[in-house]
């Protein structure tokens, strides 16, 4: 065995051209290396010259394998045009396997001639993409530049949601305007990958005058408002008075509204302490957003300073539409308005519900019967709510509403339980429900047959194939 050491990078499965084992690896036959394959490329097991191997590091590489050649190994350079230190061999020995995520491995590679700064510090970008934080830390200590490769290091760290990596890179950035504005661009464009903690890191790095510009760029940044202490620090740095802010707009109204939407009650209370008039502006919008937040505690808090009475009818109906039973029950019991609600609107909104608790509560309270509603059963079938379908049928829901649409929806969803309930509870199910016959013919022929009782074979052919028998 020849004594010179070579390298080989392999993936997590320890393979790239094939599956490898410790010790001697032989590629097919010994004469393959001298032949030309069908795609006009030579074949063999790839190995690398350590001093040039940086040119061959690839994104998915996870291990470094130590390679030694057999004494009668036949090998050729893989690419004569690019001197990248890559060779093919018909046989070679694979020795120790090292984790590329270990800084010790990187030190060993450097000792053997590997150039970590090659390809514009590609190894740092590779470490950031692979979440190898300790390797990145070591590379930065020995001079790697996080701004190379078009700042791909930052983009990879942010995309991976790697808090420690982002923090490390921010601690090692050059102090130039060019780099600063590139970081703002990364922060804006990759914000969907930033959780609140990574966003806070960037905000600590952002200049005070840019805080409002960044935080208003998209809704992802607004989740930092949940941390009241962090918001206090932003207010201390000038939140609400930065660049690109309309000076006629109250400083904190937008942020307060976003806290309502997201249910950040503690931060709302903090804003109220520094601007006692904030809740008096846009009252209806604040209440409507509190409903959409589905946070009853936020609604109750706003209610202390906002007269909800004039809006209560619309709010109850809106909550019914979006199945907010907790809100509906709270408002009805507190404001005692059930007798003044429009009965037709109530029936319409009950018909849109798919919440059994809400339906039961409202029908019992108002005296509206299930048969009076139109659409409840169809909605329940559409949303595959078997329990609600059974309840509605027991209460007398019309299985033929909308020309038998409940059955069509159940067939479309392939829900055998609902189909069985519809058929069992309604012996008078419409026999001219052609859409249901068509949709059930291939999947539930027994249902199609039952629905087709009394229909001539010629008419049935026309229904199924949409074509008359000539």
UniProtKB/Swiss-Prot annotation:
Residue intervals passing through the bilayer: none
Keyword terms of this UniProt record: ANK repeat, Repeat
The ANK repeat ranges on this chain: 119-148, 149-178, 372-401, 403-431
Gene3D superfamilies, per database record: Ankyrin repeat-containing domain
SMART domains: ANK
PROSITE patterns xref list: ANK_REP_REGION, ANK_REPEAT
The keyword Repeat appears for this protein: yes
Pfam family, any one: Ank_2
Keyword Repeat: yes
Protein name as catalogued: Putative ankyrin repeat protein L279
């Amino acid at each position: 065995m020849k004594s010179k050491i070579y390298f080989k990078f392999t993936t997590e499965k320890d393979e790239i051209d094939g599956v490898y084992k410790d010790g001697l690896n032989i590629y097919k036959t010994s004469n393959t290396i001298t032949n030309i394959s069908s795609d006009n490329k030579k074949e063999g097991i790839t190995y690398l010259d350590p001093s040039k191997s940086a040119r061959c590091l690839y994104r998915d590489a996870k291990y470094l394998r130590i390679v030694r050649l057999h004494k009668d190994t036949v090998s050729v350079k893989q690419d004569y045009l690019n001197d990248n230190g890559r060779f093919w061999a018909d046989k070679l020995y694979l020795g120790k396997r090292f984790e590329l995520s270990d800084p010790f491995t990187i030190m060993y590679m450097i000792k053997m001639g590997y150039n970590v700064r090659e390809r514009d510090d590609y190894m740092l970008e590779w470490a950031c993409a692979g979440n190898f934080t300790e390797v990145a830390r070591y590379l930065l200590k020995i001079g790697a530049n996080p701004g190379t490769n078009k700042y791909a290091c930052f983009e990879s760290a942010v995309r991976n949601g790697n808090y420690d990596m982002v923090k490390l890179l921010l601690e090692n950035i050059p102090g130039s305007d060019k780099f600063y504005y590139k970081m703002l661009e990364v922060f804006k464009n990759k914000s969907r990958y930033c959780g609140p903690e990574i966003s806070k890191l960037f905000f600590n790095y952002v200049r005070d005058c840019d805080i409002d510009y960044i935080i208003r760029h998209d809704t992802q940044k607004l989740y930092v408002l949940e941390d009241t202490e962090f918001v206090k620090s932003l207010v201390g740095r000038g939140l609400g008075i930065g660049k690109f802010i309309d000076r006629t707009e109250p400083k904190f109204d937008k942020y307060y509204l976003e806290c309502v939407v997201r249910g950040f009650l503690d931060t709302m209370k903090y804003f109220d302490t520094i601007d006692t008039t904030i809740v008096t502006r846009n009252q209806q919008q604040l209440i409507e957003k509190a409903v959409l937040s589905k946070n009853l505690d936020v609604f109750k808090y706003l209610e202390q300073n906002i007269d909800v009475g004039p809006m209560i009818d619309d709010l109850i109906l809106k909550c019914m539409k979006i199945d907010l039973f907790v809100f509906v029950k709270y408002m009805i019991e507190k404001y005692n308005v059930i007798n003044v609600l429009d009965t037709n609107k109530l029936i319409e909104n009950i018909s849109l519900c798919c919440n059994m608790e809400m339906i039961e509560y409202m029908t019992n309270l108002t005296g509206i019967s299930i048969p009076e509603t139109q659409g409840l059963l169809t909605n329940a079938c559409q949303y595959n709510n078997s329990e609600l379908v059974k309840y509605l049928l027991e209460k007398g829901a019309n299985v033929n509403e909308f020309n038998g649409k409940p059955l069509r929806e159940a067939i479309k969803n392939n829900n055998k339980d609902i189909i069985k309930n519809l058929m069992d509870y309604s012996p008078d199910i419409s026999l001219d429900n052609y859409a249901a016959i068509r949709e059930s013919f291939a999947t539930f022929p027994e249902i199609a047959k039952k629905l087709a009782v009394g229909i001539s074979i010629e008419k049935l052919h026309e229904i199924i194939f949409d074509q008359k028998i000539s």
